[in-house]
Amino acid sequence: MKAELIELIARVIQVLQINIRWMTWNLFLAFIPLVLSVWLFRRIKRSRSSVWWFGFAVFFAFLPNAPYLLTDVIHLIDDIRTIQSVWMITLVLIPVYLIVILAGFEAYVISLINMGYYLHRIGKTQWILGMELITHALSAIGIYWGRFLRFNSWDFVTQPDAVITQGIEEILGKQPLVILAISFVILTVLHWLMKRVTLGFIRQGCTNIANNSSKASLKPQTSDE
């Protein structure tokens, strides 16, 4: 029994060591658009220079990497077959995958919240929903290109011809269109849910800060005589 447990733990550690490489890399790619969204949409400066537009293009090129982590659930299925222990799968494997996938998708949600904040600030609040839906559609295409055609974000620069020709040709088939439609619905629903959860936490935090500030200002001050 002890030997079997040691062997099982060693197998779990081996699986996690293999996964930590692509998990770290995919999370790094997912947080690039999040950082860019802060720089693009949260700055006080309103002018949109050529550098801003370049950053905006890079932002959209890397943005699908954040929800792309949802598709990494296929690795979880392979790992479950490898480990074959209900307890290790439940207590170790699934929580690790949930943290990584949720972190990536939360980066996507916050990036869109930042974009919506920017549109509201420049007086284009009515564009927010449309831009979110367009972003979901483009991200669904990006996820398909990444998962099935193995394109990367930087392929827009290194091999733009292949991305445009092969990428567009591939998504016009019946099966790809079904996959894109399902991906679009999943992104839309999950974003809608997590956006409200995220904004709820933000508002709760702001309320707590405001309440603490009010209590501090109403607290009687004593003076030394």
Task: Give each language-model segment a name.
Residues 32-42, 102-119, 184-204:
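Transmembrane alpha-helical segments in integral membrane proteins
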